[in-house]
Amino acid sequence: MDERFIAYIPTAGSNVAHAEITSPKLVKMMIKRAKKPILILGENLEDKEKELIEKFIEKYNLEVIKTPEEMNLMALIKFLANSSYDLALFVGITYYYLAQAATHLKQFSNVITVSIDKYYQPNTLYSFPNLSMEEYLDYLNKLLEG
């Protein structure tokens, strides 16, 4: 794990299936091991983030679906649940929409879901922790290293 200390305090009566907090190093390993990864790209990204995400897509030769431009998120989730993709990375999607979509994938498919947004997403299987913009850009740069 990175330098950050993040306390895990389970809430009373909560589901134990929360996202594991992950690091850029682990995300890189997941992408390299995946047979068919895909990136779901939302529109909630600032210019600095967009540049780094474009480099990230190029570096790992990821298939990309832009939502809502190319496909509605709910239709996309149904598509992913029945597809041969084994790893789905999410970035730039409105938090509460992604929460619902990731819950559906978690319950009804075998797709490994990873949120690479700057906010922790408990409904994916893996997620970056809550990050400031500076820390988030650093995480994205670490994804591009090596």
Predicted features along the sequence, with ranges:
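Extended interaction regions within the primary functional domain
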Residues: 1-2, 20-21, 27-33, 70, ...
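Glycine-rich, acidic loop regions that bind phosphate or pyrophosphate groups
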Residues: 1-11, 96-146
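Cofactor-pocket helix-loop regions in the catalytic cores of large enzyme subunits
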Residues: 1-60, 64-66
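Well-ordered alpha-helical segments embedded in enzymatic catalytic cores
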Residues: 22-26, 75, 100, 139-142
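Short His-Asn-centered micro-motif
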Residues: 41-42, 90-93, 116
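Glycine-rich, anion-gripping cofactor-binding loops and their flanking helix/strand elements
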Residues: 46-107, 123-134
